[in-house]
């Protein structure tokens, strides 16, 4: 009788452990899905439209700013989650901005040192990451209320979602506007990355509409339409 009771207890403990493990896995998957698709900063929340529309004239510029944003999001979420218990609620927003500004300054200096041509191309939009609603939004909505590891994963997922949206929009505009993709990628990853540059078609003149700001709005509209169509099909 005692052996049977012990076996039942062991089975119950295994079930509980398995349920907890499955719950943890589902949390990680849900955070990732929120950042990449369900709550994508660019095509769902429509945040950070200023750099999204201004810098996405080429895939290289878009990818560069996307990676910078992802790095800033991950780092700021990490710091804010780590010190969330010590940040006074009354002055949390100025503290968040100070942490974000410090991180952006570090990223800006790194880009100035190692990817100078891209740094010049992105210009004012690197320091403007400080005012990006995505960064402060994740700090307030997630990092200040959740564990360190979950906050790091949220920052990475949201940043990756933003970087993917930027790069896809940049690639779309570059292909239609100039007939190339990843032109100047060596400015971001070095000469060894030149193989990524492709000429889709050759033209004597560029399609200016897609290179200029109107093309950014048209391209973003297309991405929104495609995403909404996919969501409707899934339903």
From Swiss-Prot:
The chain crosses the membrane at residues 63-83, 93-113, 117-137, 152-172, 206-226. It is found in: Cell inner membrane. One of its GO terms (cellular component) is plasma membrane. Keywords: Cell inner membrane, Cell membrane, Electron transport, Membrane, Translocase, Transmembrane, Transmembrane helix, Transport. Its EC number is 7.-.-.-. It is a multi-pass membrane protein. Its main location: membrane. One of its GO terms (biological process) is electron transport chain. The keyword Cell division does not apply. InterPro entries: NqrDE/RnfAE, RnfE. It comes from the Bacteria. Part of a membrane-bound complex that couples electron transfer with translocation of ions across the membrane. The complex is composed of six subunits: RnfA, RnfB, RnfC, RnfD, RnfE and RnfG. Belongs to the NqrDE/RnfAE family. This is Ion-translocating oxidoreductase complex subunit E. It comes from Haemophilus influenzae (strain ATCC 51907 / DSM 11121 / KW20 / Rd). The lineage of its organism: Bacteria, Pseudomonadati, Pseudomonadota, Gammaproteobacteria, Pasteurellales.
């Amino acid at each position: 009788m005692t052996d049977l009771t012990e076996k039942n207890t062991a089975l119950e403990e295994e079930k509980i452990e398995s349920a907890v493990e499955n719950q943890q896995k589902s949390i990680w998957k849900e955070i990732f899905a929120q950042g990449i698709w369900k709550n994508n900063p660019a095509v769902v929340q429509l945040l950070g439209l200023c750099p999204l529309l201004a810098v996405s004239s080429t895939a290289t510029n878009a990818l560069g700013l996307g990676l910078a944003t992802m790095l800033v999001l991950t780092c700021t979420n990490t710091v804010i989650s780590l010190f969330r218990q010590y940040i006074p609620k009354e002055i949390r927003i100025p503290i968040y901005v100070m942490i974000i500004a410090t991180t952006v300054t570090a990223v800006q200096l790194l880009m100035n040192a190692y990817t100078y041509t891209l740094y010049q191309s992105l210009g004012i939009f690197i320091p403007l990451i400080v005012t990006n609603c995505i960064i402060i939004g994740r700090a307030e909505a997630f990092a200040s209320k959740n564990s360190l590891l979950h906050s790091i994963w949220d920052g990475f997922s949201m940043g990756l979602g933003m970087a993917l949206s930027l790069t896809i929009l940049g690639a779309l505009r570059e292909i239609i506007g100039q007939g190339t993709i990843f032109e100047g990628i060596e400015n971001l990853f070095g000469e060894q990355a030149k193989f990524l540059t492709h000429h889709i078609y050759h033209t004597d003149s560029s399609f200016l509409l897609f290179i200029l700001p109107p093309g950014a709005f048209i391209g973003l509209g297309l991405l929104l339409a495609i995403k909404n169509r996919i969501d409707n099909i899934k339903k």
